[in-house]
Regions:
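Buried hydrophobic positions in well-ordered alpha/beta secondary-structure cores of metabolic enzymes
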Residues: 11, 22, 51, 58, ...
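C-terminal helix-coil-helix/basic helical segment that borders enzyme active sites and/or dimer interfaces
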Residues: 27-38
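Internal helix-loop-helix
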Residues: 49-119
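N-terminal glycine-rich anion-binding loops that anchor highly charged ligand groups
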Residues: 16-24, 42-49
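Glycine-rich, Trp-frequent "lid" loop and neighboring beta-strands that shape
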Residues: 63-64, 83, 106-156
Length: 156
């Protein structure tokens, strides 16, 4: 076994808190969430209050401005308890960065703080009847007409 040198003492403290959260808030509820088909909103709010959502998001948008190693810690602790359906990493590491890098300032100010707090949950809606989740096969279009966008396509 080799010693990991990637993480600092701050990461270790964060890991301890993340581990406690996963063991007390996630693990006991996993089976129920699986049966009901969704994760309770309450755990998202608790995760946001604990700083476990969008940790690398800049502070001006509600995040901690932390480095990506904090996200790595969260993912490791989630998988340590055997969970893959929580959705925090999709929310924080895929959806939020899209908004951060490609959204207008209005979009960033409106949605990112709510995503960091757990008030809003990010998701990706990318499937179509003929394409499934193959992004290359998606036929939906968005065309700007004046001040508006016209969307054409179908959703599964």
């Amino acid at each position: 076994m080799f010693e990991r040198t990637l993480f600092t003492e701050e990461h270790t403290l964060f890991r301890d808190a993340a581990r406690r959260f996963m063991e007390t808030e996630v693990q006991p509820n996993r089976e129920r969430w699986e049966e009901q088909g969704y994760v309770d909103r309450e755990v998202w709010l608790k995760a946001g209050a604990a700083g476990f959502l969008c940790p690398s998001m800049p502070e001006q948008y509600g995040g901690a401005g932390a480095d990506k190693r904090y996200s790595t810690v969260l993912i490791e602790e989630q998988y340590r308890i055997g969970d893959s359906g929580l959705g925090f990493s999709l929310h924080s590491e895929i959806v939020a960065p899209y908004l951060l890098h490609y959204g207008s300032e209005h979009i960033k100010q409106t949605y990112l703080p709510k995503m960091a707090s757990g008030e809003m949950i990010g998701a990706i809606a990318m499937t179509e009847p003929a394409a499934g989740s193959d992004l290359q096969g998606i036929k939906t279009t968005a065309v700007k007409q004046g001040a508006h966008w016209v969307l054409n396509g179908s959703k599964t």
